[in-house]
Amino acid sequence: MAQGVLWILLGLLLWSDPGTASLPLLMDSVIQALAELEQKVPAAKTRHTASAWLMSAPNSGPHNRLYHFLLGAWSLNATELDPCPLSPELLGLTKEVARHDVREGKEYGVVLAPDGSTVAVEPLLAGLEAGLQGRRVINLPLDSMAAPWETGDTFPDVVAIAPDVRATSSPGLRDGSPDVTTADIGANTPDATKGCPDVQASLPDAKAKSPPTMVDSLLAVTLAGNLGLTFLRGSQTQSHPDLGTEGCWDQLSAPRTFTLLDPKASLLTMAFLNGALDGVILGDYLSRTPEPRPSLSHLLSQYYGAGVARDPGFRSNFRRQNGAALTSASILAQQVWGTLVLLQRLEPVHLQLQCMSQEQLAQVAANATKEFTEAFLGCPAIHPRCRWGAAPYRGRPKLLQLPLGFLYVHHTYVPAPPCTDFTRCAANMRSMQRYHQDTQGWGDIGYSFVVGSDGYVYEGRGWHWVGAHTLGHNSRGFGVAIVGNYTAALPTEAALRTVRDTLPSCAVRAGLLRPDYALLGHRQLVRTDCPGDALFDLLRTWPHFTATVKPRPARSVSKRSRREPPPRTLPATDLQ
C-alpha cells in the first residue's frame, strides 16, 4: 500500500505543472496529502496507476531518466486516476512542490519542517520509493539496457552497506569500507571523449583506480546523481559549486515563498541536501523493515516529530549524524562515479557527459564527495537568523577581522532548561535578543552562535559581526553559548560535540578560525561563574583548551558582570 501511494504522489508531483497552492508549504501539509491518498486510493489500484502519473511527467531531464530506469515505470494513460484522489487544496500543494528548482534567487519544491529545516520534497519521495523497492542494484559495466526493476536484482546484504541508521554517536563518515574491484569499466564503455579536446584539456586527469562495479538505486536517485552533475558543471566552467546555501521564508506560520541568501546558489541547496539525505535515511530504513511496513504518513510524522519508533535520535534533527553513519566517503565517491557512468549509457546521453573519460568522471566524483562529506555532513546544521525570527540589528554592526584566534564558551544560565525542539529554542533566542537589546542596550543578541539540545546551532551575530559576549575580547574570538545552566549538570553529548569538534573544525576549514585557535571558558577572561562549574571542568580536558590566560583586572569589569545574574523572567544570560 505504501509503495503504491508513493507512486501516485510522485506522479502528481512530476506530472503536474507548477501552480498556486492554498495550503502553507509545510511538511505537515505533505504528510496530510499522503494520509489522504492512503485513505482514499485502493491498495490494489495504486501501484499501477501511480506509475502512469510518473511516466507522463513532461520533464525528460537526466534525473527523470534515473527515476525511470532505476525505479521503474509503466506506460498508462494518467487520466485513469480521474477523479483525482486529492482534495483541491492538496492537489494545489502537489503542484506547488512539483519539482525542485532554483530560479532568480528563489527556491521551489521545498517545505518547512517542524524542526525548522527546509526540505526539498522530490529527493525525499524518490528515496522513499527506492527503499520500498528494496534498494535495487545495477551492475557495471552494463551488459544490457534492461532496467534493474525488470531483473529483480536487490542488494544481498544491505546492512553491510548501511548499518543501523539510529547510530548517532559517530560525528563523521566511517573510514573503513569494503573494497570495490572489477574489470576496468573503460574497456566496456564506448569512448565518449572523441571530438572533445576542449573538455579533455579543461579537467585535471585522475588515474581511475577501482572503478565502480554497481549503482545503488537509493543513493543514485537521491544524492549521487545530483552531486555528480552539479560538480560536473562546475568542473567544466572552472568554478566551485556552492553547497548548502540557506534561505529565508516570507513567514514561518504559513510559509509561501523561499528566498535564497545567495541568489547565485547552485541546485545543491541546504533544502535539497536535507531532502536527499532524509530520502537516503528513510529509504534505507524501509528497505530493512519487513512487511507490514508503517504507512508513509505515519513514518514521516514520526521522523519529523519525536522520532521513528519513539527513538529521539532517529529524527530529522540529527540527519547529518545518521546519514554519516550509513556509508563511507569511498563508497559514496564510487556511487557518484557509477551514477555518472550510468547516465552516460542512458539515452539520450547527457550532453556534458558525452565527452568525459572515466578518469575525469572519477575526479568529479572525488571532488563532489569531498565537499559533501566535509562541508555538509561534517559540519553542524545552523539555523540562520531569519529562521528563529531575529529582530534587525540596532545600529551598524562592526565587522570582525578574520580569521580569529579564540573560541569563548558560555552557558546561557537563563534560560536554564535545555531546549530540545525548534519551537522552544527559537523562543529562547528571541527572548535573549530582546533582553540584550532592550535591557542591556546592545545592538543585537550578544553571542556569535547558540547551541540547542535539539541538534541545531542558532546563528546570533554569526561569523562576521563583532559580538557582545566576552568583555574586552569580543573582537578576538567567537562567543558560543549552550542553552541551559551547567553549574551542576552537563549538556547533551550532541551539543558538546558541536562545540568541541564540528563547529570549530568547519570554521577552520572555511578560514574563519585559525588552526591553532585557543578555547577558553568565559570565566577565564571575566569574573563570572560562566560557563558553569560542570561544563568548565569538562572544557579543561578538551584539546584546544588553554589554561594560561589570566582574567582581566577587577577594575575593568563592571560590578554586575562579576556574578551570575539571578533567575528572572527575561533571560539575563551572560553580561559579558
UniProtKB/Swiss-Prot annotation:
Phosphoprotein listed as a keyword: yes
GO molecular function: N-acetylmuramoyl-L-alanine amidase activity; peptidoglycan binding; peptidoglycan immune receptor activity; zinc ion binding
Carbohydrate attachment residues: 77, 367, 485
Expressed in which tissues: Strongly expressed in liver and fetal liver, and secreted into serum. Expressed to a much lesser extent in transverse colon, lymph nodes, heart, thymus, pancreas, descending colon, stomach and testis. Isoform 2 is not detected in the liver or serum.
Residues with the Deamidated asparagine modification: 274, 322
Reaction(s) catalysed (UniProt annotation): Hydrolyzes the link between N-acetylmuramoyl residues and L-amino acid residues in certain cell-wall glycopeptides
Cofactor entry: Zn(2+)
GO annotation terms (biological process): biological process involved in interaction with host; defense response to bacterium; defense response to Gram-positive bacterium; detection of bacterium; immune response; innate immune response; negative regulation of natural killer cell differentiation involved in immune response; negative regulation of type II interferon production
Signal peptide region: 1-21
Region described as Disordered: spans on this chain: 550-576
Effect of residue 447 to A: Abolishes amidase activity
EC number(s) given by UniProt: 3.5.1.28
Principal location: secreted
Residues reported to bind Zn(2+): 410, 522, 530
Phosphoserine: residues carrying this PTM: 239
Keywords from the UniProt entry: Disulfide bond, Glycoprotein, Hydrolase, Immunity, Membrane, Metal-binding, Phosphoprotein, Secreted, Signal, Zinc
A Gene Ontology cellular-component term: extracellular region
Domain N-acetylmuramoyl-L-alanine amidase as annotated: residue spans: 406-532
Source organism, top-level taxon: Eukaryota
Protein name: N-acetylmuramoyl-L-alanine amidase
Organism listed in the record: Homo sapiens (Human)
Gene name, Swiss-Prot/TrEMBL: PGLYRP2
